Amino acid sequence: MGGMSGLRRVYLARPRGFCAGVVMAIEAVERWAEALKEKGELVVYHEIVHNRVVVERLQAKGVHFVEDLAEVERLRRERRLADTVVFSAHGHPPAVRRQAAEMGLTVLDATCPLVTKVHTEAKRYAKEGYWILLIGDSADHQEIKGTYGEAPERTILVAVHTHVGKDPRLADPRTVEVPDPERVVVLTQTTLSVDDTLATIAILKKRFPKLVVPSRKDLCYATQNRQEAVKRIAPKVEAFLVLTSPHSSNGMRLLELAQSLVGRAYRLERPEELRPEWLEGVESLGITSAASTPEDLVQGVVARLKAQNPGLEVVEEGAWETIAFREPKPLSPEEVLKGA
């Protein structure tokens, strides 16, 4: 671990780690897995949050994760299920809700309220005859699938400007076309880089002068806060560690931001992935984590750094968030169909 021996100070970004939506979703799964264990095992549609450690810990408690509700039929033959499905924090298309109800499943919708807000806007603008330009980083991201599914006939997927060409299903904001340029609105995936999202909206605004632009509040507060925390620390450090899954959009945007500001930024999911050569010549280090990364993983990294540097100074920089979301209530198949 010789590469870490010169480290003198670590700045821990605040806020970091779990946001209110993630806390709500994970706590809902844990509570209902325990409450329903006499009836059977719980099923979650998609990873509850994009973090492998979280998923593995829930699997150890008997929770099953599926990417297609058709998998529930197979599980019913192999396991004793509680006939309850939890929808992940990222949102889901209306067709999935209907499918769950038609299968007789009770639904716990753990979609983040901020994502639900975007879904509501998509439905409203589509009903009013607008064309929706939905900015995202991948057509495969669960949040994009969910929002697109609310109004597929009126929605055009657009790449955030830094990702143009990476996914051919996402249009270039500089050349995208809509059937009616007079009635067009922009919505966004909530976990993108705030700066990149605003830059992409500016490009679209030039192309479509009558573009309806939601308020900045439509960008996820947790995404903004974590990115601002990295910006505050960046001038004080020579390298950054970002604890995130490669599937976490908000986490990967933190990594890109840290790389752009500091130059040396490294991704890891678990403390044991820390590599000494990353910290060669580094005296001051910044650490942050994605909105779906458990805090104990961050503390595990700090413990490893302290073991190599007994006099290491650890500075908590910034303030924690105080927002909390209510846990979802179970919905019967009839209630789901009524609201679908």
Swiss-Prot record:
Binds 1 [4Fe-4S] cluster per subunit. The active site is at E143. [4Fe-4S] cluster binds at C19, C112, C220. One of its GO terms (biological process) is dimethylallyl diphosphate biosynthetic process. The keyword ATP-binding does not apply. Isopentenyl diphosphate binds at H50, H90, H141, S248, S249, N250, S292. (2E)-4-hydroxy-3-methylbut-2-enyl diphosphate binds at H50, H90, H141, T190, S248, S249, N250, S292. It holds the Pfam family LYTB. Its cofactor is [4Fe-4S] cluster. Dimethylallyl diphosphate binds at H50, H90, H141, S248, S249, N250, S292. Keywords: 4Fe-4S, Iron, Iron-sulfur, Isoprene biosynthesis, Metal-binding, Oxidoreductase. Signal peptide: none annotated. InterPro entries: LytB/IspH. Pathway: Isoprenoid biosynthesis; dimethylallyl diphosphate biosynthesis; dimethylallyl diphosphate from (2E)-4-hydroxy-3-methylbutenyl diphosphate: step 1/1; Isoprenoid biosynthesis; isopentenyl diphosphate biosynthesis via DXP pathway; isopentenyl diphosphate from 1-deoxy-D-xylulose 5-phosphate: step 6/6. It is an enzyme of class 1 (oxidoreductase). It catalyses: isopentenyl diphosphate + 2 oxidized [2Fe-2S]-[ferredoxin] + H2O = (2E)-4-hydroxy-3-methylbut-2-enyl diphosphate + 2 reduced [2Fe-2S]-[ferredoxin] + 2 H(+); dimethylallyl diphosphate + 2 oxidized [2Fe-2S]-[ferredoxin] + H2O = (2E)-4-hydroxy-3-methylbut-2-enyl diphosphate + 2 reduced [2Fe-2S]-[ferredoxin] + 2 H(+). One of its GO terms (molecular function) is 4-hydroxy-3-methylbut-2-enyl diphosphate reductase activity. Its EC number is 1.17.7.4. Belongs to the IspH family. Catalyzes the conversion of 1-hydroxy-2-methyl-2-(E)-butenyl 4-diphosphate (HMBPP) into a mixture of isopentenyl diphosphate (IPP) and dimethylallyl diphosphate (DMAPP). Acts in the terminal step of the DOXP/MEP pathway for isoprenoid precursor biosynthesis. This is 4-hydroxy-3-methylbut-2-enyl diphosphate reductase. The lineage of its organism: Bacteria, Thermotogati, Deinococcota, Deinococci, Thermales. The gene is ispH.
